[in-house]
Amino acid sequence: MGSPRRIVTTLAAFLLVPTIVSAQATRQDVTPEQRARMQVEREARIVAELVSRRPIEALNSIWIEELTWMEVRDLLQAGTNTAIISTGGIEQNGPYVATGKHNYVLEGTCEGVALKLGNALCAPIIKLVPEGDIDEPSGHMRYSGTISLRQETFEAVLEDVASSLEAHGFEHIVFIGDSGGNQRGMENVARTLNERWHKAHAHFIPEYYQYG
């Protein structure tokens, strides 16, 4: 059973479909001048919306995906300056443990770290990571159910997610990974971002995985 907020969001999406279809049909009859004016008006509405007050009580969650954009904005303005990007994986974990083990672990540990810090939010867990070669399966890819990303794909995803968070005003982007194959990519991306950024900082935390 989903949360009440998710149920309402899903229903709203279904109700919007007829409106979207109607708007698409109307746009076909609009002149270039009218389209330009509509674009200016649309931009003005967006600018006003970006500074508008949140109309509902804030949800008590540290997961960005569970918050509205206004809730994230207000938390940033109130001093929440850290975002945690956690990486898990879908891989074989023996005959008794689910392939999503690392992702399930991170649901608890990322939240615990964020709550301990007190000024942090958790980005959506990166659930797909390098697990071995795909074309000629190696590593975990030799086991059914494993899903792998190429190393360059993984690093590109990390870089884009971190850059998105930095663009919104997060000053500290923290990388933690629950699997050994994730560590090199996070370290590489953190180094690249720190060379590029002037104010924000990327932090790769190897101790999260290598705690022994």
Predicted features by range, described:
Residues 1-11:
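Bacterial N-terminal signal peptides that target proteins for export
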Residues 9-19:
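Bacterial N-terminal signal peptides
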Residues 21-25:
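Boundary at the C-terminal end of the N-terminal hydrophobic targeting segment
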Residues 26-94, 98:
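Active-site and ligand/interface coordination hotspots across diverse enzymes
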Residues 27-37, 43-45, 54, 63-65, ...:
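Active-site histidine-anchored catalytic micro-motif
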Residues 96-103, 135-138:
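Glycine-rich loop at the start of a catalytic domain that most often binds anionic cofactors/ligands
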Residues 102-114:
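Short catalytic helix/loop segments, enriched in acidic residues and glycine
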Residues 111-130:
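Active-site machinery of serine-nucleophile hydrolases
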